[in-house]
């Protein structure tokens, strides 16, 4: 599932810093920097064992049915109501969970709501739950969860959250938000397109990247929550659409990226990371994401079962 690359030039146990990766990108090119960052993640003690475990689980047939007793609850991405075909509603996650007979649900956040607005909705929803749950967020939904974790009553709200699957989450903002709100002619055309579809982009002001922005804060992840992040690690040759290539190129000055996320930021997140070689922010071109999601859910089921279903 995770294609092996040529030997890395960095020690496999040391994840390079953002500065080091940018130096490599300047000296050797963005593709070389992306390759080395990917290899460092894949070969690190923290993430490598997890990646190998997930890959081993993917070879099992048929998949074992869900044992943990906790439902998978989706925190959807932007436009999940207006454009469910985009996958922002978490359909892929729900379908794989249902293959395991895992119950699913969705937190009804505002499709284009502010971070503060959706953070409150998430906390209120979780406060009403009396059982363990596993959260799974998509893209902007990850930012909404991050801000929910900063709410005053987050400790109480998240006490029953056993794990969090962060699928391409924009946890630190994205430089693309500023570009999309700029006076660039292409950005103006993009905004006009969304306006005609009745889809406002005002929420992008919350997703700005850099010092002083709303997401320029530490992720306050409770120790009891097991976090798993899934993100794409593409080279330029992997990007099959003109839009994906333009987005990737605009972020190249920050180092390896998926067209929306800066990958050195992704690597600095707590928890475990599964890097998908060759995929962009929307996990394109076509990869076997279905099998990967199924395997990660099985991994969480095995890891959490003893804690969520104690034996008498």
Q: What would you call each of these model-derived segments?
A:
Residues 86, 175-180, 238-243:
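Short aromatic-enriched loop/helix-cap "lid" or pocket-rim segments at secondary-structure transitions
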Residues 73, 105, 163-165, 228-230, ...:
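Hydrophobic/aromatic beta-strand patches that form the interior of the parallel beta-sheet core
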Residues 116-219:
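Serine-dependent carboxylesterase/thioesterase catalytic core
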């Amino acid at each position: 599932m995770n294609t092996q690359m040529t030997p890395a030039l960095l020690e496999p146990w040391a994840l390079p810093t953002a500065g080091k990766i940018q130096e490599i990108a300047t000296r050797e090119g963005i593709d070389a920097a992306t390759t080395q960052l990917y290899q460092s993640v894949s070969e690190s003690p923290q993430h490598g064992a997890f990646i190998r475990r997930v890959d081993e689980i993917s070879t099992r047939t048929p998949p074992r049915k869900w044992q943990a007793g906790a439902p998978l609850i989706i925190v959807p991405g932007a436009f999940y109501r207006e454009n469910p075909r985009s996958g922002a509603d978490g359909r892929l996650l729900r379908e794989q969970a249902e293959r395991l007979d895992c119950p699913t649900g969705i937190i009804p956040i505002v499709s284009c709501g502010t971070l503060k607005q959706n953070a409150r909705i998430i906390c209120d929803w979780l406060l009403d739950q009396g059982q363990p749950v596993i959260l799974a967020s998509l893209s902007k939904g990850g930012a909404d969860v991050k801000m929910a974790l900063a709410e005053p009553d987050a400790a109480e709200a998240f006490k029953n959250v056993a794990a969090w699957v962060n699928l391409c989450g924009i946890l630190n903002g994205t430089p693309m938000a500023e570009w999309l709100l700029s006076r660039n002619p292409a950005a103006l055309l993009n905004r006009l397109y969304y306006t005609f579809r009745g889809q406002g982009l005002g929420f992008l002001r919350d997703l700005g990247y850099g010092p002083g922005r709303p997401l320029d804060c530490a992720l306050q992840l409770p120790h009891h929550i097991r976090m798993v992040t899934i993100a794409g690690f593409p080279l330029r040759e992997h990007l099959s659409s003109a839009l994906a290539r333009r987005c990737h190129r605009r972020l190249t000055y920050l180092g390896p990226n998926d067209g929306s996320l800066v990958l050195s930021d992704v690597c600095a997140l707590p928890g475990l990371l599964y890097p998908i070689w060759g995929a962009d922010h929307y996990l394109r071109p076509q990869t076997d994401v279905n099998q990967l999601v199924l395997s990660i859910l099985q991994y969480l089921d095995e890891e959490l079962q003893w804690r969520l279903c104690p034996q008498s």
